Amino acid sequence: MGAEKITSKIMEDAKIQANVILAEAQKEKEALIKKAHEEAEKKKQAILKKGEKDAEMTRNRILAEARLSAKKNSLEERERTIAKAIQKLEEDLVKLPQKDEYKDILLKMIITGVYSVGGGELDLQLNKNDWKLIDDSTLWALEKEMEDRLKKVTVLKKGESLPIIGGCVVKTADKTKVSDNSLEATFERNLDIIRAKIAEMLF
């Protein structure tokens, strides 16, 4: 084999080798590019997934806050409505002594007070206007009725006038037992029941 042929053979082998190297390099390049694309896609999906998760969390938080705020506003509005209704009842309570049926109500409150302390020698306290409704004959009739019911001598003495809207306060003579049946005290004692009934009617 001549020098020229040897040189040609070397050049041909070198070219083949170079082409093999270039092909492998191209494959590696393409593999790296593909891997880079895959990595980028994975990162993209991860970012999108995190974004979706964050967005969902933000949405849920906003909805929860909105529901909480709506519930709070509803409760506040409910309380305002109940408060207005109670205020109206308090205004009506002040006007109750002016009504025709008030004397019967007052007599029942006195009887309840006498029952509560158990009869005996008692002090009856009213406001100034109500003493005009309860004269001596009415007191005597009340005493007789309570004696018959309690089977116990009962004496109702006129006590001091009180600055109350209406109703009565009944005390034993030794002041060991007191029944506050004033309109305002009765209203206050039953306020929870009143609130519940208002809520039941309105809501």
Swiss-Prot record:
The record's subcellular locations are: Cell membrane
Under the heading InterPro entries, the entry gives:
ATP_synth_B-like_membr_sf, ATPase_E_C, ATPase_V1_Esu
What is one process in the GO biological process aspect for this record? proton motive force-driven plasma membrane ATP synthesis
Q: Its topology with respect to the membrane?
A: Peripheral membrane protein
- Please name the Pfam families in this protein's record: vATP-synt_E
Transcription listed as a keyword = no
Q: What's a GO cellular component annotated to this UniProt protein?
A: plasma membrane
Q: Which GO terms describe its molecular function?
A: ATP binding; proton-transporting ATP synthase activity, rotational mechanism; proton-transporting ATPase activity, rotational mechanism
Q: What's in the keyword line of the UniProt record?
A: ATP synthesis, Cell membrane, Hydrogen ion transport, Ion transport, Membrane, Transport
Q: What is its main location?
A: membrane
Would you identify the family this protein belongs to, as annotated? Belongs to the V-ATPase E subunit family.
Any idea what this protein is called? A-type ATP synthase subunit E
Q: Which organism is it from?
A: Methanococcus vannielii (strain ATCC 35089 / DSM 1224 / JCM 13029 / OCM 148 / SB)
Q: Which gene encodes it?
A: atpE
